[in-house]
Structures are given as structure tokens and as C-alpha cells.
A protein has these predicted regions:
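Formylglycine-dependent sulfatase
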Residues: 2, 11, 16, 20-22, ...
């Protein structure tokens, strides 16, 4: 009888120990499963009155309207700044532009400084959480290596570093001198004649396919409807 009781107790201890090991593993697996992919679409120089779902009558925005219909539509929301660079710095850091260190538009010339590297971006936070991270599109938060996307938490980057480009030549045409501005992973690339938003779609699709077995974050700041 004593041996049976001892064996029963031993089995109970083993089962408890096994459960103690399995439950945290299951909780971790569940947490892993709950990490959603994140696609952050950021349009350029577009106001709320430039979308049908907010009352616009002089243009057609079916895809944006579909996103609004299937998601959440804010009726009271304010951008942190009315111009490009500070609003992007605020979005990336969750801070007021002044606290993020970029309260004005960064220079669109190579060597122009922008948001300080010490600022912590959402890309850095998501990367630390195990996400594959990509910037695809417009940057405009600094045109020096230590302030460009790969130094701000992005594993992969494709796009233009300055404020705007022509969609086909990918040249910057604003107050001169005209200059080419298209980069992939910190290296200048040429896709003359190809429509930039289409290139963005192709780059995002390839990144998603490459990282289909892990959580990913794509910051997709399209350069439209901004000039030119």
C-alpha cells in the first residue's frame, strides 16, 4: 500500500512538473501566434477632405474607403505637424516633433541632417520584439547614413530619402540642382521609366513573401498625392 501511495504521489509530482514546464511554453507559443503583421500606410500631403469617406466629391478613393469601411474611422484626429518631416518623426517615435528633434522639414540634399539617431522608433521596438522590419517609400527624416532607415530600426529599405521625386525618373526637382534619389539598402539604384508606386508594391510583396513565416512590419509611406 505504501509503495502504491508513493508511486501515486511521484506520478502527481511528475505531472505537475510537466505541466509547469508545458504551460509557459504554450503561453509563449500563444503569444507568438498573437503577433500580427503590421502594414502602416502613410500618404503624403493628403488632408482628410481628400478622401470620399470624409466627404470629398471631386476625386475617387475606393481603396481608402474600403479600409475605412472595414476598420476604424476617426472623426477627430490631428497630425502632429502640417509638413512632411516633423509629422513623420512624430509618427515614428510617438513624440511631439520638438521632442523628437525634428520640428521642421529636413533637407532633401545628401548630407542633410534630420531626426537624431538617439530617438527610438517603432521599427526599433518591433524589431526587438522579433519582427522583420521594412521601410518602403519616402523617408525625409535625414539624409546622412546614421539617420537613414537602416540606422533607425529597419532591416530593409527601399525608396527616396528626400522630400519628393518624379515618379518615373526618380529625380528630385525642387529649387535645383536636379538629382537622382532612389535607394535600396543604402545603395543608389536606377529604375528609369518605372512608376514609383508600382515599385513600392513590388518591393512590399517581395518582402512579405520572404518573411511569410515570421511577423513583419512594413512602413509604407507612399509619395502621393504630394508634388509632382
Amino acid at each position: 500500500m505504501f509503495k502504491i501511495q508513493l508511486l501515486t504521489r511521484y506520478r502527481s509530482i511528475c505531472l505537475f512538473s510537466l505541466a509547469a514546464m508545458i504551460l509557459p511554453m504554450a503561453a509563449t507559443a500563444a503569444a507568438e501566434a498573437r503577433r500580427p503583421n503590421v502594414l502602416l500606410i502613410y500618404t503624403d500631403d493628403q488632408g482628410s477632405i481628400d478622401v470620399n469617406c470624409y466627404g470629398a466629391k471631386d476625386l475617387i478613393t475606393p481603396n481608402m474607403d474600403a479600409l475605412a469601411a472595414s476598420g476604424v474611422k476617426f472623426t477627430q484626429f490631428y497630425s502632429a505637424a502640417p509638413v512632411c518631416s516633423p509629422s513623420r518623426a512624430a509618427l515614428m517615435t510617438g513624440r511631439y516633433p520638438q521632442r523628437a528633434g525634428l520640428s521642421h522639414n529636413a533637407s532633401s540634399a545628401r548630407g542633410g541632417t534630420g531626426m537624431p539617431t538617439q530617438q527610438v522608433t517603432m521599427a526599433e521596438m518591433l524589431k526587438a520584439a522579433g519582427y522583420a522590419t521594412a521601410h518602403i517609400g519616402k523617408w525625409h527624416m535625414g539624409y546622412v547614413d546614421e539617420q537613414m532607415p537602416r540606422a533607425q530600426g529597419f532591416d530593409y529599405t527601399f525608396g527616396h530619402m528626400g522630400g519628393c521625386i518624379d515618379n518615373y525618373s526618380h529625380f528630385f526637382y525642387w529649387q535645383g540642382p536636379n538629382r537622382h534619389d532612389l535607394w535600396r539598402q543604402g545603395k543608389e539604384v536606377w529604375h528609369d521609366g518605372e512608376f514609383f508606386p508600382d515599385l513600392m508594391v513590388a518591393e512590399a510583396s517581395a518582402f512579405i513573401q520572404q518573411h511569410r513565416d515570421e511577423p513583419w512590419f512594413i512602413y509604407w509611406p507612399i509619395n502621393t498625392p504630394h508634388y509632382p
